[in-house]
């Protein structure tokens, strides 16, 4: 899966938007959360459901989860659920909040720092959160792929950040805890210098739940970087 595939999906949905009441996209589970997040921003304000689903076990297996996931996905696509969602193992997850948290279990995805939109029981969609949408959707057809990810480790100096920012327009930094950054090795000066040159630096956390708060530490508070406190990595990307 590559960003150009996301744009292909957007074009397909846009060209057929007036012909159908909902859309189902079957997708591999490894990068499904990235696609759901991307489509959530590339197709905004859709009153029609755009559902992604897949399976942990192939459809040819007796124990496959593909049949129930597909059935649930089409049930949701035929509902009034707006926007982009992942439907998996009876759970309905907002596209910008999904994260793959299990590699083998049927419950492959979790909703991070946000409740499930709903759940399916005996073929009925029970919505926990009702998000009404009556707007006209907007479709985008451009992406900037020059984004890098840096996961901090103890003792890390500025060399990796310099390397990525020389070659990309934006850098996502997975920091420690609520937003801790190294105070040694010129790390702060490195980031501040690149930001002043027009680069985009985003701070998030390696911890999956409860988000970040870069203002807790002085080095994070004084840095002129963007902080997304409760979003998943695929959504930030």
Regions found by a protein language model. Give the residues of each.
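Catalytic cores of soluble, metal-dependent hydrolases
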Residues: 154-228
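ATP/NTP phosphate-donor binding region
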Residues: 1-14
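Accessory alpha-helical/coil subdomains and C-terminal extensions
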Residues: 94-178, 183-184
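Short, acidic/small-residue loops that bind anionic groups at enzyme active sites
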Residues: 38-65, 78, 195-205
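Internal gly/pro-rich beta-alpha loop/helix module
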Residues: 52-121
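Short Gly/Thr/Asp-enriched flexible loops that form oxyanion-binding sites at enzyme active sites
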Residues: 26-47, 183-190
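Conserved small/polar residues in nucleotide/adenosyl-binding loops
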Residues: 229-235
